Amino acid sequence: HYVMLDNIVGLGNCKYKYLINSAQLAWLKKDLALVDKSTPLIVSMHVPAYTYTGISDGKPMTKKRNTQYQDVQVLINILKPFKEAHILTGHDHRNRNIQITHNILEHNFASASAISWKLNDVRIMTTDGTLSGYQIFDISGKQIQWHYKAVGLTPEKSQFRAYDLNTVPEKYGGNPASNEILVNVFNWDPRWKISVTEDGQELPVEQLWEKDPLYMYIRDKTQRFNNRPKDWRAVNCIHMFHTKATEANSEIVVSVTDRFG
């Protein structure tokens, strides 16, 4: 069952606020009253319902978007009785998957146009380092699967980027002679598995709230932002993973596995 909501309220002069108004929520409640609770739901709207705020005690922290706090909670309460519900959102031009409840997952999508409406050789990724691309949903009956695909790449080559922090300049997050490894897993959600081995031995992996080194480098080098110095800065993201090898020249294998295996 598919639903489209409008949670942008125009205020004039290119200003707006985030709001799912009461009329839409009342309509949605009536609409879903006619839908079997075992039917998967896909609810789309522009602005995310939730966002990540960091990591505390090794666990990702989330919050509702401030200006639509109350109406988001009403929306969640309406969706809770269903076996499976997906909220599809955009707006921020970055990738986030947030497990709101055991049965409600928000997918906040990166953009095929990366960080702006123009796609060119310097705008190939978003502010969290996700390659410009789009989400593909495969739906068969009541079964839903999804994966991320970068523009111009196969799905297999669209999932992560790994950094040898020995070789990354310090101003972009590098750490010379540390043997540290940073992995950006673009479409991560809490049911993914991240594995890094050194010469066949598993290394401990830690989730970080961190910026993407390559995006910081690209933004620093391009001249296209000189007249807008605060726009599209690198942001901390939840899908960064860190480990440390024992040697600089050992064989490192990074493997990421989504919830579908």
Question: Over which residues does each language-model region extend?
Answer:
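Hydrophobic residues embedded in beta-strands of well-ordered beta-sheets
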Residues: H1, Q143-I144, I252
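His/acidic metal-ligating clusters that form di-metal
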Residues: V3, G12-E106, N179
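Conserved beta-sheet core of the metallophosphoesterase superfamily
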Residues: P60-V168, E202-P204, K221-Q223
